[in-house]
Amino acid sequence: MSKIIAIVNQKGGVGKTTTCVNLAAAVKAKGKRVLLCDFDPQANATSGMGVDKSVSNGVYDVLINGTETAKAIISTPYGDVLPSSKALAGAGVEMIEMENRQFLLKAALRQVVEQYDFIFIDCPPSLELLTLNALCAANSLLVPVQGEYYALEGLSDLMNTVRIVRRSMNPSLDIEGVLLTMFDGRTNLSIQVAQEVKRFFGTKVYSTVIPRNVRLSEAPSHVRPITAYDRNCRGADAYIALAEEFLKRNA
């Protein structure tokens, strides 16, 4: 049974793209069939998987120009990629006039979903039409949360949006899990945020936490996931552990 997971948080800088790239690669390394759909116009997940951002076909062409989804997918050693590009930045405006505009991504992924065990969608850091498409296409959401004061405020906005989507567009949308990122267990703030997140989401919070790690920050500039850049660092260990926990929940 295929599963589509949107990795989403409208707050930027929380490790969303880092999580999408590294979780997808780690799950692929466990023998699963994986597609990463880069739905962020910054296209950082595309380059993070080793794919050139200037690729001729991508998710924009699928949504706006009717390109077949399979023809836009690129295979990499870390999993397949449906790439993004700067052109996607204007797609929200172009989609406004289109019929069933909130379901365009769902229709695109339906063409290939049976070919994969898991499809991970890297969402833009906002709650507009692109993200709405991801929420309508997904079976579940994975929410990265940084250990800082404003993190909980952003979660409240996201959950309000999820309630609206469930009510009228995707009633079965589930919370896959909540992931604490850039976590520093030496600080009271990180510990307090973790306690609040666990109080709110309970068992949905992964026991795996992603630490602050320089090697994680370096890996994108080397256009590869952390497990291919430095398998022996703390960041790689964390994402491998997350993949194991993720797969155990989905066994």
PLM-predicted stretches and their roles:
Residues M1-A251:
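P-loop NTP-binding core
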